[in-house]
């Protein structure tokens, strides 16, 4: 890995470490998403506690955390496998943010943002899959899992040279969802839009 790739990997992690959900909730004077609802600082939990506008803002910012470093690295001519490493770094920053006590989200939106520079056709297929599963079953985590399992196949169909880095990224997302997988099997996973909240954790 050359110096440019190393630099972009570090930048990707630091950018990913900016928790959009926590910052937007602070600005809007909403509860800390790490202490209410699903305790996950992501768009789905912010939807529960703050509504569609706040959730949309979080979704956009989280996607940009993946898009900006990967697109920049692509523009600089960094090879596909290393683009995957940079994408993973952005997602790791989101999952384990340096600036927020390593309490982060699941990385789905950031991963989507990281994949987006490959092409709008691939991005559209991924978003359509997530929306279809989410509408049918109303589980954000299930939609994410189905989508990331299919994403490498979609990539192989459209731009096969990026299949390995996308596959690496998708494996990380599946591992991060291990608790959601358990709750799906036990019937304890909250559905999209549920308003039932836990009391905020004491500081």
Swiss-Prot record:
GO terms for cellular component: plasma membrane. Its EC number is 2.3.1.275. Keywords: Cell inner membrane, Cell membrane, Lipid biosynthesis, Lipid metabolism, Membrane, Phospholipid biosynthesis, Phospholipid metabolism, Transferase, Transmembrane, Transmembrane helix. It holds the Pfam family G3P_acyltransf. It catalyses: an acyl phosphate + sn-glycerol 3-phosphate = a 1-acyl-sn-glycero-3-phosphate + phosphate. It comes from Vibrio vulnificus (strain YJ016). Catalyzes the transfer of an acyl group from acyl-phosphate (acyl-PO(4)) to glycerol-3-phosphate (G3P) to form lysophosphatidic acid (LPA). This enzyme utilizes acyl-phosphate as fatty acyl donor, but not acyl-CoA or acyl-ACP. NCBIfam families: glycerol-3-phosphate 1-O-acyltransferase PlsY. GO terms for biological process: phospholipid biosynthetic process. This is Glycerol-3-phosphate acyltransferase. Belongs to the PlsY family. Coiled coil: none annotated. It is a multi-pass membrane protein. Pathway: Lipid metabolism; phospholipid metabolism. It is an enzyme of class 2 (transferase). The chain crosses the membrane at residues 4-24, 80-100, 117-137, 139-159. It is found in: Cell inner membrane. Probably interacts with PlsX.
């Amino acid at each position: 890995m050359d110096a440019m790739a190393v630099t972009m990997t570090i930048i990707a992690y630091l950018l990913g470490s900016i928790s959009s959900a926590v910052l937007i909730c602070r600005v809007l004077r909403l509860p800390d998403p790490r202490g209410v609802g699903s305790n996950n600082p992501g768009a789905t939990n912010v939807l529960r506690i703050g509504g569609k506008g706040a959730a949309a803002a979080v979704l956009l910012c989280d996607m940009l955390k993946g898009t900006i470093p990967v697109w920049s690295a692509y523009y600089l001519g960094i090879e596909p496998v290393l683009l995957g490493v940079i994408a993973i770094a952005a997602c790791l920053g989101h999952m384990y943010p340096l600036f927020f006590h390593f309490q982060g989200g699941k990385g789905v939106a950031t991963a989507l943002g990281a994949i987006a520079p490959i092409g709008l056709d691939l991005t559209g297929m991924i978003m359509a899959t997530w929306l279809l599963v989410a509408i049918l079953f109303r589980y954000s985590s299930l939609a994410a899992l189905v989508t990331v399992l299919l994403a490498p196949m979609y990539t192989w169909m459209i731009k096969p040279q990026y299949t390995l880095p996308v596959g690496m990224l998708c494996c990380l997302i599946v591992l991060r969802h291990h608790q959601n997988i358990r709750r799906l099997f036990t019937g304890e996973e909250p559905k999209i839009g549920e308003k039932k909240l836990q009391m905020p954790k004491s500081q």
